[in-house]
């Protein structure tokens, strides 16, 4: 397996990170995950635009142009012969010696790019049968719009869900539902798609954006606004979405069944529209539903 370290492809076991890299010591960096279908990137530009936007919000300079970055990632995918999978890439602020919270202003740090590509098949069964979720207080910082390497709050919530045999943790600040530990959450109520507004309390998921777009194009009303735990529990349908899980229905929350406990009709429609978008961009999907 080859991975990318700056502009070099190296064997996985030969890849190294400096112990005084600010990403390693502070989580000082940003990242993205881009999906591949039939060996082709899906919503690549949207992901990379978000990467550069996240970097700009923390005054981090990515040491490659968008064109150079695409060329590097395409080489990474080709070298590993990825058909259906994910590319994980991150950029840290770089090495600072000696370690200091303060970013030096007397000399520029050189950002460090790393990336890996892996085959990750689509989970067709999960898209139909769905999964369960727990609710958990959202204790993360207030800049969730930045796709930062700082994910400890997400990790704790995700692992709590895992310990309870749940797929996800739906996060809330008091009564206000925000998103999940590693995905966005949406509800359907009276035929309306309802999801939290794209503000600082959530990451504006690329899949979320595609869902909103196809919903509007196909006459499904969309409401981007706060909703409560009560709204969540009384929803007709609940689903989560992300680059890797596409649109996955939630059938039970905190052990309580959502509606009839099955994927709802609008969730199914939205997933079909989503698959059509993938097909247009990347070609027909084998076994797609």
From Swiss-Prot:
Transmembrane segments: none annotated. Keywords: Aminotransferase, Pyridoxal phosphate, Transferase. Gene3D superfamilies: 3.30.470.10, D-amino Acid Aminotransferase, subunit A, domain 2. Pyridoxal 5'-phosphate binds at residues 50, 179. Its cofactor is pyridoxal 5'-phosphate. Its EC number is 2.6.1.21. It catalyses: D-alanine + 2-oxoglutarate = D-glutamate + pyruvate. One of its GO terms (biological process) is D-amino acid biosynthetic process. InterPro entries: Aminotrans_IV, Aminotransferase-like, BCAT-like_C, BCAT-like_N, Class-IV_PLP-Dep_Aminotrnsfr, D_amino_transT. Coiled coil: none annotated. The keyword Cell inner membrane does not apply. GO terms for molecular function: D-alanine-2-oxoglutarate aminotransferase activity; pyridoxal phosphate binding. PANTHER family: AMINO-ACID AMINOTRANSFERASE, D-ALANINE AMINOTRANSFERASE. Acts on the D-isomers of alanine, leucine, aspartate, glutamate, aminobutyrate, norvaline and asparagine. The enzyme transfers an amino group from a substrate D-amino acid to the pyridoxal phosphate cofactor to form pyridoxamine and an alpha-keto acid in the first half-reaction. The second half-reaction is the reverse of the first, transferring the amino group from the pyridoxamine to a second alpha-keto acid to form the product D-amino acid via a ping-pong mechanism. This is an important process in the formation of D-alanine and D-glutamate, which are essential bacterial cell wall components. Homodimer. This is D-alanine aminotransferase. The gene is dat.
């Amino acid at each position: 397996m080859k991975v990318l370290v700056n502009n070099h492809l190296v064997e996985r076991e030969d890849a190294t990170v400096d112990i005084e890299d600010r990403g390693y010591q502070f989580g000082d960096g940003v990242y993205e995950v881009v999906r591949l279908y039939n060996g082709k990137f899906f919503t690549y530009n949207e992901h990379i635009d978000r990467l550069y936007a996240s970097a700009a919000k923390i005054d981090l300079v990515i040491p490659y142009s968008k064109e150079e970055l695409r060329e590097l990632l395409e080489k990474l995918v080709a070298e590993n012969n990825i058909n259906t999978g994910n590319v994980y890439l991150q950029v840290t602020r770089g090495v600072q010696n000696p370690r200091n919270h303060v970013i030096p202003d007397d000399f520029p740090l050189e950002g460090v790019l790393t990336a890996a590509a892996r085959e990750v098949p689509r989970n067709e069964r999960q898209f139909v049968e769905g999964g369960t979720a727990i609710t958990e207080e959202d204790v993360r910082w207030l800049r969730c719009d930045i796709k930062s390497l700082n994910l400890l709050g997400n990790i704790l919530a995700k692992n709590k869900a895992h310990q309870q045999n749940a797929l996800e943790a739906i996060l809330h600040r008091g009564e206000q539902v925000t998103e999940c530990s590693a995905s966005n959450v949406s509800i359907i109520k009276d035929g309306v798609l309802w999801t939290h507004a794209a503000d600082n309390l959530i990451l504006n998921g690329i899949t979320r954006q595609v869902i909103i777009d196809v919903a509007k194009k196909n006459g499904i009303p969309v409401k981007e606004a706060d909703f409560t735990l009560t709204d969540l529990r009384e929803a007709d349908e609940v689903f989560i979405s992300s680059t890797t899980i596409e649109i996955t229905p939630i059938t039970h929350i905190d052990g309580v069944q959502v509606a009839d406990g099955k994927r709802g009709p609008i969730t199914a429609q939205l997933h079909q529209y989503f698959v059509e978008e993938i097909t247009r961009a990347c070609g027909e999907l084998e076994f797609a539903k």
